[in-house]
Curated annotation (Swiss-Prot):
Localization per Swiss-Prot or TrEMBL: Cytoplasm
Listed PANTHER family: TRANSCRIPTIONAL REGULATORY PROTEIN YEBC-RELATED, TRANSLATIONAL ACTIVATOR OF CYTOCHROME C OXIDASE 1
Similarity section: Belongs to the TACO1 family.
Keywords: Cytoplasm, DNA-binding, Transcription, Transcription regulation
A GO CC term attached to the entry: cytosol
One MF term in the entry's GO annotations: DNA binding
GO biological process, one term: regulation of DNA-templated transcription
Domain of life: Bacteria
Protein name per its UniProtKB record: Probable transcriptional regulatory protein Cthe_2075
Pfam families: TACO1_YebC_N (PF20772), Transcrip_reg (PF01709)
Signal sequence interval, chain numbering: none
Length: 242
């Protein structure tokens, strides 16, 4: 997977996560609400819920908070109906951007997302305008440490069905097809590996760079501002750099 901007993205995300854990937990709680309504509250039956629980644990979300979110979603009391929406557009300098959101009010969310694209030199496009530039992939990140043997991890990941294995500066990155993600993640979990990140994401096929300082400034602000919106779950792009 050489050339995609995953590593740049994770550095960006890690800074945000450390500073805004409460907001991250709220967003994961919404994801739990959606997958529980789709497939029920039992993670042994609902593989999507099992995947979101793994994501929650990777974000250091407390078990009590996870269980409370599941129970709340399974009952009708105090439960908000959320739906998933995806926005596509271009950032400054023609960077392709995909925004995934969960919302109880499509009009509000669309207005907020459009405002930020306009504010920072981009434009919101129509469905499909940039998604063809991305592939849906399972992405698992495991922190490098003395306890993790690179060759062992690579062989286990590939034996479980991973498509690719890369050693980055601080992390091992494992890429899977979306349909193999749960199997690979669960297999590594059973082997005792802990994840910095484990989820299905939109990975750019190729990346682009920005040279204009104003474009770089505005692109950073666009990503930050979109991620700060309560309704936004994920922001994907094909910009290499940050």
């Amino acid at each position: 997977m050489a050339g995609h901007s995953k590593w740049a993205n994770i550095k960006h995300k890690k800074q945000k996560t450390d500073a805004q854990k409460g907001k991250i937990f709220t967003k994961i709680g919404r994801e739990i609400a959606i997958v529980v309504k789709q497939g029920g509250p039992d993670p042994e039956v609902n593989s999507k819920l099992k995947d979101v629980i793994a994501k929650a644990k990777a974000a250091n979300m407390p078990n009590e908070t996870i269980m409370r979110s599941i129970k709340k979603a399974a009952g009708e009391v105090d439960s908000t109906n959320y739906e998933e929406v995806v926005y596509e557009g271009y950032g400054p300098g023609g960077v392709a951007v995909i925004v995934e959101a969960t919302t109880d009010n499509r009009n509000r969310t669309a207005g907020e997302v459009r405002h930020l694209f306009d504010k920072f030199g981009g434009n919101l496009g129509t469905t499909g305008c940039v998604s063809f530039m991305f592939d849906k992939k399972g992405v698992i990140l495991i922190e490098k440490s003395d306890k993790v043997n690179e060759d062992d991890l690579m062989m286990k990941a590939l034996d479980l069905g991973a498509e690719d294995f890369t050693a980055e500066d601080e992390y091992f990155e494992i890429i899977t097809a979306p349909e193999d993600f749960s199997k690979v993640r669960e297999g590594l979990e059973k082997e005792g590996y802990e994840f910095v990140e484990a989820e299905v994401e939109m990975v750019p096929q190729t990346t682009t760079t920005l040279t204009d300082p104003k474009h770089i400034e505005f692109m950073n602000k666009l990503i930050d501002s979109l991620e700060d919106l309560d309704d936004v779950q994920n922001v994907y792009h094909n910009w290499y750099g940050e």
